[in-house]
Curated annotation (Swiss-Prot):
A motif ('HIGH' region) lies at residues 9-19. The lineage of its organism: Bacteria, Bacillati, Cyanobacteriota, Cyanophyceae, Synechococcales. Catalyzes the attachment of glutamate to tRNA(Glu) in a two-step reaction: glutamate is first activated by ATP to form Glu-AMP and then transferred to the acceptor end of tRNA(Glu). This is Glutamate--tRNA ligase. Keywords: Aminoacyl-tRNA synthetase, ATP-binding, Cytoplasm, Ligase, Nucleotide-binding, Protein biosynthesis. Belongs to the class-I aminoacyl-tRNA synthetase family. Glutamate--tRNA ligase type 1 subfamily. A motif ('KMSKS' region) lies at residues 248-252. Its EC number is 6.1.1.17. NCBIfam families: gltX_bact. InterPro entries: aa-tRNA-synth_I_cd-bd (IPR045462), aa-tRNA-synth_I_codon-bd_sub2 (IPR020751), aa-tRNA-synth_I_CS (IPR001412), aa_tRNA-synth_I_cd-bd_sf (IPR008925), Glu-tRNA-ligase_bac/mito (IPR004527), Glu-tRNA-synth_I_codon-bd_sub1 (IPR020752), Glu/Gln-tRNA-synth (IPR000924), Glu/Gln-tRNA-synth_Ib_cat-dom (IPR020058). It catalyses: tRNA(Glu) + L-glutamate + ATP = L-glutamyl-tRNA(Glu) + AMP + diphosphate. GO terms for biological process: glutamyl-tRNA aminoacylation. Its main location: cytoplasm. Disulfide bonds: none annotated.
Length: 476
């Protein structure tokens, strides 16, 4: 059997990290098995589904490197198939029309609640005779379609993550609504549990991989598979992503959208790497830093955890920093250039920009850090408190003055590191201070602060665009 898996997001919002992690696990399993990864856009919620969310989801998957193998399926384009399946269930007497009004159903739930019972449909219209149906129709009542669920039904499957799973029909809340309310004798909009079964069968999906919050849906859907005589896929229910307090990660916890992570300066490689680790343990002796392609060679469900996976910002930041540190300077510049241009900076020649990217790379955690750290190379910096304090030290300005005098009288063809070090030594001796005082003071003059990348390389870059002398003079 060929492995075919699918991601089935609803375009009612941007690509959530939970959905993206599900996509990663689906993609890894498909690639490990030599199978196919498909995408189905579940847009049957007409009020909340928006084209811009579909675009965001697909672009997010592309950004993460999760390429799909067939054109994405749009669920709403197959509604006739869904209604045909409902009609088949009606014809087989495995489903029926329920005319109970919302007011009646709410009263039923309130009564159950008052009696200390869990709310569930009481199957009141399960066995209406033709005369009763005609009476409801003559009142102008609309109806939903419900799928019959026997309380004694035994539902079992072997979950690829959780092992044997066992449910009973009585656990599922009564007969299940499979289409929205519509005028009598019509079939309203088909609902999730029916639609998913029909679509997965039509797409020949072999494995359904999704979050553990779908376990109850799986129990319901297995009954529909059997009723329609459709082949049943294997199921894997992955752990939820949790916040620091152990609750399901939600929008209340802040950033959860992949596009937000992208805007914050996280790389696609680090995000995909981290999401793989959210609920999956690497084989012993395997580095926790890897590409998707590397992970696909060893991915298996026996290493997917049952317990929820806590989101760890420190781990994500570390992974992102490692990716940025190791990027070749041309690739790093490719990422940084748009950010520098967006900041309004006129960029010098390419080689200078490449050298700046190489200088900043080891100190970056996020791509956006490359804007803050590059700022003093494009704009004259404001002296910070630590810089002012350094320049006020005894001998600091005298040493910088001597350094400036040497530079004014020195002729060199390009910036020479050895000669620069000698100039600093000379300045320290002239001011009768340690060389470190002069180096810190020079950093304060060039960058406005004492923290920053390698001093000599920084000096060389600013010298190449004629800014070193200007900044020294400003501080004297």
């Amino acid at each position: 059997m060929k492995v075919r898996v699918r991601l089935a997001p609803s375009p009612t919002g941007t690509l959530h990290i939970g959905t993206a992690r599900t996509a990663v696990f689906n993609w890894l399993f498909a690639r490990h098995q030599g199978g196919e990864f498909l995408v189905r856009i579940e847009d049957t919620d007409k009020e909340r589904s928006k084209p811009e969310f579909t675009t965001n989801i697909l672009e997010g998957l592309k950004w993460l490197g999760l390429n799909w193998d067939e054109q994405p399926i749009i669920q709403s384009q197959h509604v006739d198939d869904h209604r045909a399946a409902i009609q088949k269930l009606l014809d087989l007497d495995l489903a029926y029309r329920c005319y109970a009004s919302e007011t009646e159903l709410e009263a039923m739930r309130e009564t159950q609640k008052a009696q200390g019972q869990a709310p569930r449909y009481d199957n009141r219209h399960r066995n209406l005779n033709p005369e009763q149906e005609a009476a409801f129709q003559s009142e102008g009542r609309s109806a939903v379609v419900r799928f019959r669920i026997d309380d004694v039904a035994a539902i079992s499957w072997k979950d690829l993550v959780r092992g044997p799973m066992h449910w009973r029909g009585s656990d599922l809340g009564g007969d299940m609504v499979i289409s929205r309310r519509a005028p009598a004798k019509e079939i309203g909009d088909p609902l999730y549990n029916l639609v998913v079964v029909v679509d997965d069968a039509a797409m020949s999906i072999s494995h359904v991989i999704r979050g553990e919050d779908h376990i109850a849906n799986t129990a319901k859907q297995l009954l529909i598979y059997e009723a329609l005589g459709l082949p049943i896929p294997q199921f894997a229910h992955t752990p939820l992503i949790l916040n620091s307090e152990g609750r399901k990660l939600s929008k209340r916890d802040g950033v959860t959208s992949i596009s937000d992570f992208q805007a914050m300066g996280y790389t696609a490689e680090a995000m995909a790497n981290y999401m793989t680790l959210l609920g999956w343990s690497v084989p012993e002796g395997t580095d926790e830093r890897f590409t998707l392609q590397q992970a696909a060679t060893v991915f298996s469900f026996d290493r997917v955890n049952k317990a929820g996976a806590k989101f760890d910002w420190d781990k994500l930041n570390w992974l992102n920093s490692q990716v940025l540190h190791d990027l070749p300077k041309d690739q790093l510049l490719h990422e940084l250039k748009p950010l520098w241009s967006e900041a309004g900076w006129a960029l010098p020649e390419e080689n200078w920009c490449l050298d700046l990217a190489e200088l900043l790379g080891p100190s970056l955690t996020l791509l956006k850090d490359g804007v803050d750290q590059a700022r003093p190379f494009f704009e004259e910096p404001t002296l910070q408190a630590d810089g002012l304090e350094q320049l006020a030290m005894e001998g600091a300005k005298a040493g910088l003055s001597n350094l400036l005098d040497q530079l004014d009288s020195t002729s060199w063809d390009g910036f020479d590191v050895k000669q620069a070090q000698q100039l600093l030594t000379n300045a320290a001796q002239a001011a009768n201070v340690k060389k470190g005082v002069i180096m810190k003071s020079l950093r304060a003059a060039l960058l406005g602060r004492l923290q920053g990348p390698d001093l000599i390389t920084t000096w060389g870059l600013l010298a190449r665009i004629g800014q070193d002398l200007n900044r020294l003079r400003r501080c004297l």
